[in-house]
UniProtKB/Swiss-Prot annotation:
One GO CC annotation: cytoplasm
Protein name: RNA exonuclease 3
Region listing for Disordered, in residue ranges: 37-136, 612-638
Biological role stated in the UniProt entry: 3' to 5' exoribonuclease required for proper 3' end maturation of MRP RNA and of the U5L snRNA.
Segments of skewed composition (Basic and acidic residues): 55-76
Nucleus in keyword set: yes
Source organism per UniProt: Emericella nidulans (strain FGSC A4 / ATCC 38163 / CBS 112.46 / NRRL 194 / M139)
Gene: rex3
Main location: cytoplasm
EC number: 3.1.-.-
Enzyme class, spelled out: hydrolase
Amino acid sequence: MFAPLGLFRDIPCPQREECSLIACLFSHRDLNSAPAAQDQVLEQKEPAKLPPKRLKLEPRPEAKETPKDDLRHVSDSGRSTPVKKTTAPATNAENISPVSRQPNIPKNTATAPIKRELNANTGSSIPPRRAPKEALNPRMIQKSPATYNVRMAILKKLHGTLCSLNDQLAKDKALEDKCLILTPDELITMALDEEEKVAKESPTVYSNVVKLRIVKLSRMSKEDWAKELKDYLNKKYYKIKAEPVQKEPKPFKTDLSVEEEIAVASQLITPLQGLEDFGYVTRVPTAEEIEIAKRGVAEAKGWEKCERCNARFQVFPGRREDGTLTSGGTCTYHPGKSFYPPRKKTDHITGTMREGYFTCCNQKLGESSGCTTGATHVYKVSETKRLASILQFEKTPENPDLHNPTPICFDCEMGYTTLGMELIRLTAVSWPEGKKVLDVLVRPLGEVLDLNSRFSGVFPEHYTNALPYSTAPTKSSAPSSSSPSQLQLVSSPAAARTLLFNLLTPSTPLIGHAIDNDLNACRIIHPTVIDTAILYPHPGGGLPYRMSLRTLAKKHLDREIQTGGASGKQGHDSVEDALATGDLVRVKAGLVWGRLKEKGWIVEEGRLVAPDSSSNTVSMQTKLGEGAGAKRAREGTS
């Protein structure tokens, strides 16, 4: 239609390699010259394809463009290695060709060495930044919030403010992270990103938002600018996921005194009678039951079902002749639980299919056999008589030497061995103060298959660095999250159980979450327990469904716990879990005491005293009732 004037043919294309136009108005000459120059240099580096006489003819006219310093190096190298007329060594061709092609290198590649140098000074393994070369020109969007002149004026002001902050960092000699100093291209890109973001997100108040942003940047300190710049660079270039920051839990406070909390705890005791079907052990297995369990294990010849992938495999306690502990090879499984998204009433209208997925990898159920591979298969023993065949249960003995014992919160960590899932760490803290009174590593009875470090937080190096347990009394410490590498090691689960018995009497409240698992791991039968899994029943009807400790801590304490288990790098911390369990009981104790106080109850000498007229009535109201599911089942059958 019209003859092109070529007014933009000398201007580099702003889109560079990403330009998709067939006949672009801008120049792409610099983009194509660099690869061509590199190809020519590579071609000259191949001595087999070069005729011997070309070495004399071609370098001379191009040597005029070479700087004097470079010519001096070339001449010196020529004197050290004389060139014969008949042959041309390949080394001389390599020395001359880069010098002759140096003027053809595009100018826009001069910023690359700067970025590499800045990143190298940090000493980190972050990838190099590759900012596109853009003009300081507002980016085109579908609906512009202002005229071009207004956007251009604001963009220049924003760019100038960013340059000023960047110059302050560049002049700071004490700056350790030199990679925070931006190149001119990166400053332009950052200004364009800031302006474009406001133009898209706040078009109606575009001018005010950008001006406030410029004022905030101009008043920002170097420390705040460096922090904000790190977040921007990570999102823009590095895309490195930040490790979860574990915050120190805030101490939980109530309006009750320690004496009042301990007194109210007597109203929160969980009766275990009738809960045997849910894993709670209330009596010691007999010798006949243990013998039956041993015969069953002998007849099975070591064949078990994998706890993770449900595969059948054979386990060899004490090792097989060739040193093998298990058969079946490696185990491929999903460490996370399966999750089904809640359905909506409009799903049948919209046709939405909500399929279940695994929380560890977000894969749909049935897509793969697993996302994690374990060295061996593992299994867990849940039958009471078989647990007793490995280590017999014991009831909490009387302890006449222990006067006025305080309630104890305890938590156990378990790992997989050739005998099933065994105790590997035991932690106990006082309640309600939360002082640590016992925290030891435990050497299991069987050979270790998997320490279950993703959840237990115990790694092999913790056993390597552990010291034998000392009977010397240890000072109670403030609530803290100790590393297992600092713990002492006891010889067996029975030894750990004895240490816990030294802190208890049969009437001492023992507090835990899903306490049946911890009691069974220690082989303890304790008559006075407070289980937060029953204290806070599941909305689905109570047992066998249970709310996780992490969910309860977030809901009632506004506390994030067990954050190390997501990545598998740290795992859970039994001290953290024990403290959270104790604080959940304190929350419930405060609610119960509020109702008791309204009824006229008081605390005298560490005991609850009921009013004379309605002591029995109020006492029954404060005790825990049966779950909602049991109530509905009873009402439906009657």
